[in-house]
Curated annotation (Swiss-Prot):
GO MF term (any one): 4 iron, 4 sulfur cluster binding
Family named by the database record: Belongs to the radical SAM superfamily. Biotin synthase family.
Pfam families given in the database record: BATS, Radical_SAM
Protein name per its UniProtKB record: Biotin synthase
Organism: Thiobacillus denitrificans (strain ATCC 25259 / T1)
UniProt entry tagged with the keyword Metal-binding: yes
EC class name: transferase
Quaternary structure annotation from Swiss-Prot or TrEMBL: Homodimer.
Annotated residues for binding of [2Fe-2S] cluster: C101, C132, C192, R264
EC number from the UniProt entry: 2.8.1.6
Keyword flag Flavoprotein: no
Length: 317
């Protein structure tokens, strides 16, 4: 793997659309070549995600069953006890995960809410795991507190292209997201930032999301690509499913535009066949969320993932 390469060119939306339009075999060939230039193609990074505070969120994200605006059958749950978080973190480490992400359904944490999360970060870090948190928007100084506690990564997704964003969320604007990402960078935290596809956006808008992500400077260290999980009770429950090969194309284009980032298969993996996941790995995905639940939606069981890894000859980082 050779990192002595020129800076990554910033591509326009039309240039990214042209990548999407390549013949499938050509796109996969290019993406796999770029992937091999920067990563071992047979190693996958494993992260586990735990909801440390569930439901009751004031935001109106149209895909999210945790919003107070929708009746999606999610029971609100207060912040977990430290002991419960550590129990889950130990189980994740024993199962092979190298990173543990803690997610809270907040618009953003108040200082009194942040304090117990800082303790969670310190204790999970002491287990020898990389730490990640997704807590919503951060105020000035909060990213620095998380960094001091031992946080490695902060997740804050752009979700979709600016042109489609207002169709999905009205309680938080695009600049709010960019401002939080800037605070995270200033605190010298690694950035985990991606989006969701299959929400009814056009291919042009998928290209627009990737263009926005790739334009972040520096580019995110981790890029989670979520496939919409259509949850009954949310506004997007009846959205037409994205074609599997279009999702694979999205992974390949993401790899070409962000060659040094870890590209993670995130939500929606439970509904993918092993063959589709294998194509995603071939296209440059090299990270997954590992464990039977992602916040409030399902995820493949550990045993299924291990069987898939064995059949593909890949191992965990």
């Amino acid at each position: 793997m050779n990192d002595m390469t020129p800076p990554v060119p910033r591509r326009s939306v039309s240039e990214i659309e042209a990548l999407f339009a390549l013949p499938f075999a050509d796109l996969m060939y290019q993406a796999q070549g770029v992937h091999r230039a920067h990563f071992d193609p047979n190693r996958i990074q494993l992260s586990t995600l735990l909801s440390i505070k569930t439901g009751g969120c004031s935001e109106d994200c149209g895909y999210c069953p945790q919003s107070v605006h929708y009746d999606a059958g999610v029971e609100s749950q207060g912040l977990l006890d430290l002991g419960d978080v550590l129990k889950a973190a130990r189980a994740a480490k024993d199962a092979g995960a190298s990173r543990f992400c803690m997610g809270a359904a907040w618009r953003g944490p108040k200082q009194r809410e942040l304090e117990p999360v800082l303790a969670m970060v310190r204790e999970v870090k002491a287990l020898g795991l990389e730490t990640c948190a997704t807590l919503g928007m951060l105020k000035d100084g909060q990213a620095e507190q998380l960094k001091e506690a031992g946080l490695d990564y902060y997740n804050h997704n752009l979700d979709t292209a600016p042109e489609f964003y207002g169709e999905i969320i009205t309680t938080r604007d695009y600049q709010d997201r960019l401002d939080t990402l800037e605070r995270v960078r200033r605190a010298d935290l690694h950035v985990c930032c991606g989006g969701i596809v299959g929400m009814g956006e056009s291919r042009t808008q998928r290209a627009g999301l990737i263009a926005q992500l790739a334009a972040l400077d520096p580019q995110p260290e981790s890029v989670p690509i979520n496939l919409l999980v259509r949850v009954e009770g949310t506004p997007l429950a009846e959205t037409e499913a994205l074609e599997p090969l279009e999702f694979v194309r999205t992974i390949a284009v993401t790899r070409l535009c962000m060659p040094k980032s870890f590209v993670r298969l995130s939500a929606g993996r439970q509904q993918m066949s092993d063959a589709v996941q294998a194509l995603c790995f071939l296209a440059g995905a090299n990270s997954i969320f590992y464990g039977e639940k992602l916040l409030t939606t399902g995820n493949p069981e550990w045993e299924r993932d291990q069987r898939l890894f064995d059949s593909l000859g890949v191992t965990a980082l």
